[in-house]
UniProtKB/Swiss-Prot annotation:
PROSITE patterns assigned to the protein according to its UniProt record, in alphabetical order: RIBOSOMAL_S12
Subunit structure: Part of the 30S ribosomal subunit.
NCBIfam families: rpsL_bact
GO terms (BP aspect): translation
Coiled-coil residue spans: none
Protein name: Small ribosomal subunit protein uS12c
Keywords on record: Chloroplast, Plastid, Ribonucleoprotein, Ribosomal protein, RNA-binding, rRNA-binding
Entry similarity comment: Belongs to the universal ribosomal protein uS12 family.
Organism: Chara vulgaris (Common stonewort)
Biological role stated in the UniProt entry: With S4 and S5 plays an important role in translational accuracy. Located at the interface of the 30S and 50S subunits.
Protein localization: Plastid, Chloroplast
Pfam families noted in UniProt: Ribosom_S12_S23
Amino acid sequence: MTTIQQLIRKKRKPIENKTKSPALRNCPQRRGVCIRVYTTTPKKPNSALRKVARVRLTSSFEVTAYIPGIGHNLQEHSVVLVRGGRVKDLPGVRYHIVRGTLDTIGVKDRCQGRSKYGTKRPK
């Protein structure tokens, strides 16, 4: 426990929260270019081939971003929009690619939760 005299000499430092998505540099999203599009396997109890892309952002960071939804049209040199949000069973993947913007098309034949996958309303 500090004394009043110690507090007068040196004030308490506020706790600074560390950001979970440093590559975005306090922006909601960032544009980037795909360097490599590949699949990777998740952590222990799960089994799948998760689609991810290595993206070079305009903030000059290079990050691994998850491609949500079924099927995608991404390849090398595709321009994508990246948002924060980790994938719990993929270590090191702390970003998501936004579907339906720039070079990324929305998920085909999606009827529920369409806004999350950039799909237009079916006629």
